[in-house]
């Protein structure tokens, strides 16, 4: 169990695994339902459609492989599939998080209160509605930060050779970091921590955050498991917040 006192930060793998346990806590499960439903509808529908299109998309991607790399086509084909899953999964994960942002924030708040014994501000439907403009402004901040970087990486996919070798690795690392930002931001935002300050705080635990984001990214690509990943990641990130940053940044005790 995570405590409210300052503890030695653990690995991102630990916090990701904790997320799967924390979503089942009595009293927390009811706050998991709405984020879970949003994720099931969006990710389930999106990946069903994606798998009906892969037969057409992958040959199109492989057509950009230069002649001098054709001898590696048997290795590049699975890389192309993984690339499509990574990009597609990240974009739809971002969309799902946009829609579920108010409910993810509420889940993070209630879990933090459960883990620490602290008393959160009064919440509920009216509280969520009141906070929606601020929450969506925060989502726009994240989008404005990530979109230019994502566009640069997507352009690399169209460069012969680089697009089939280096670009997928760079995209995976980028999506891992962005997913760490996405999910860790919920408890930070609950305490009105500025976006820039939040990113600086995450950099103090780079390895743990990359591990956490990488696992979240991988599970986003796996059918069935990806339907449950949103509330799991929110809970894991909240546990990390309690251990690593709450003592310094908490607005309510």
From Swiss-Prot:
Transmembrane segment boundaries: 31-51, 72-92, 151-171, 222-242
GO cellular component, one term: plasma membrane
Molecular function (Gene Ontology), one example: high-affinity sulfate:proton symporter activity
Subcellular location: Cell inner membrane
Keywords annotated in UniProt: Amino-acid biosynthesis, Cell inner membrane, Cell membrane, Cysteine biosynthesis, Membrane, Sulfate transport, Transmembrane, Transmembrane helix, Transport
GO biological process: cysteine biosynthetic process; sulfate assimilation
Presence of the UniProt keyword 4Fe-4S in the record: no
Source organism superkingdom: Bacteria
Family annotation (InterPro entries): CysZ_sulfate_transptr, Sulfate_CysZ
Topology of this chain in the membrane: Multi-pass membrane protein
Role, per record: High affinity, high specificity proton-dependent sulfate transporter, which mediates sulfate uptake. Provides the sulfur source for the cysteine synthesis pathway.
Recorded family membership: Belongs to the CysZ family.
Protein name, entry field: Sulfate transporter CysZ
The species this protein was found in: Salmonella paratyphi A (strain AKU_12601)
Designated gene of the protein: cysZ
